[in-house]
A protein has these predicted regions:
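Thiamine diphosphate
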Residues: 19-211
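N-terminal amphipathic/basic-hydrophobic helices that include classical n-h-c signal peptides
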Residues: 1-30
């Protein structure tokens, strides 16, 4: 057997002790676990804010909502964002549409009941004129809801989005939030089509869990 010069069979002199830090993540899992822990330590609203900023979505209209309060406060405190309240949700969609035509990207925050005000704005403006409206809906009407009005809109919200061919995602898991929002926002602007993110109480610990 030929042995390359300088290499002695059976010698461990040139070998370094193996460390789990040098192993791929798929084997050691150390870095992957650390990353997962860091992600889970971030509140959902921080993830949404960071993802919007990364995708240059800097204009955010909203109708005040308790679930979205921490996100709204953070947006107002961040000089990179222009956040403002509107009287109704369809007004917010109109402003977003005008902003898009003027070269700005925007999002709207609303509660489930507020979604009931926007089907006409979606059907007559956002969808036919290909406005990539980014919509976040704090979900009410399920998991112990006490308000019948919220429950009725919750039952019809997804069928309305389906009938208008508006992509929508119901997000229940913290570890899926960033990926779903980031990729869907990118797709929304690339295809010029609206997208709705329905944030489950399982994600936000929303109002239905207060009682």
């Amino acid at each position: 057997m030929l042995v390359p010069a300088g290499l002695a069979l059976g010698s461990n002199s040139d070998k370094k002790p193996m460390s789990t830090q040098t192993l791929p993540n798929a084997i050691s899992g150390t870095n992957a676990t650390a990353s997962a822990s860091e992600a889970s330590a971030r509140p959902w609203y921080d993830i949404v804010q960071a993802t919007l900023k990364r995708n240059d979505v800097k204009l955010v209209a909203y109708v005040p909502d308790k679930v979205f309060t921490p996100l709204i406060k953070n947006l107002h405190a961040d000089k990179d964002f222009l956040a403002f309240a509107t009287a109704r949700e369809e007004e917010a969609l109109g402003i977003l549409s005008g902003a898009w035509m003027g070269g700005r990207r925007g999002a709207v925050l609303m509660q489930t009941s507020g979604f009931g005000t926007i089907p006409n704005a979606l059907a007559s403006l956002v969808v036919p004129y290909q406005i990539p409206a980014i919509m976040f809906v704090s979900e009410r009407g399920t998991l112990g809801e006490f308000n019948l009005g919220q429950a009725l809109v919750c039952r019809t919200m997804r069928p309305v989005l389906e009938s208008l061919a508006v992509e929508h995602h119901t997000i229940t898991r913290h570890d899926e939030l960033e990926f779903i929002v980031d990729r869907s926002v990118k797709q929304s602007f690339a295809t010029q089509a609206a997208v709705a993110f329905i944030l489950s109480p399982l994600l936000t610990a929303g109002r239905v869990f207060e009682n």
